[in-house]
């Protein structure tokens, strides 16, 4: 067999909500101690420990795109240690793959949108319009040039680079 495999990691930029959670937790610890005393500090430390275990690892996310022939699999890697499968689909069943700001996408109105990009406004983001679970879906990805070439091999006239 002559399978084509390519993997790409895209680190997601930290969102404002993640920074707000960290700032809020520190503010509660600092300003709560004089008001209620040492008990407030212990409660804040306990909340920070719970947040450190459950919330903070979810703030550091990388998306891994793996394309094997025409099957695209997207995984999220949290804190560089935990992997979670997000989505997989056959790109040949996509209606169109085009840059996010392409006018070719104006006629498509997805029911559900998945965003697996870095969050950088200057990045080259592509939209994959595909039917998933009987719903029209839009999957935003951020492929590099090599992944685009792999996808073009299988997509033909349904892939646009404009």
Question: Where are these predicted regions, by residue range?
Answer:
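A cytosolic-side transmembrane-helix exit/cap motif
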Residues: 59-71
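N-terminal membrane-targeting/pre-transmembrane regions
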Residues: 1-26
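Transmembrane alpha-helices and immediately adjacent membrane-cytoplasm interface residues
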Residues: 43-61
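Membrane-cytosol interface motif
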Residues: 68-86
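Structured surface patches comprising rigid loops and adjacent beta-strands/short helices at the edges
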Residues: 86-106
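Cytosolic, membrane-proximal regulatory domains of ion/volume homeostasis and mechanosensation machinery
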Residues: 100-120, 124
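A membrane-cytosol interface segment of integral membrane proteins
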Residues: 115-162
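Transmembrane helix interruption/hinge and helix-loop junction motifs
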Residues: 31-43
């Amino acid at each position: 067999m002559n399978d084509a495999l390519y993997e790409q990691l895209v680190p997601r930029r930290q969102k404002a909500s993640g920074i707000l959670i960290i700032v809020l937790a520190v503010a509660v610890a600092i300003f709560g101690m004089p008001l209620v005393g040492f008990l407030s500090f212990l409660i804040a430390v306990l909340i920070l420990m719970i947040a450190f275990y459950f919330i903070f690892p979810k703030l550091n996310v990388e998306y891994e795109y793996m394309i094997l022939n025409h099957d695209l699999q997207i995984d999220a890697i949290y804190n560089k240690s935990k992997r979670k499968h997000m989505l997989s689909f056959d790109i040949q069943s996509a209606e169109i793959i085009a840059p996010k700001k392409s006018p070719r996408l104006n006629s498509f109105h997805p029911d559900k949108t998945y965003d697996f990009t870095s969050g950088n406004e200057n990045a080259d983001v592509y939209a994959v319009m595909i039917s998933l679970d009987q719903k029209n879906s839009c999957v935003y990805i951020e492929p590099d040039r090599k992944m685009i070439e792999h996808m073009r091999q299988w997509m033909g006239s349904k892939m646009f680079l404009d």
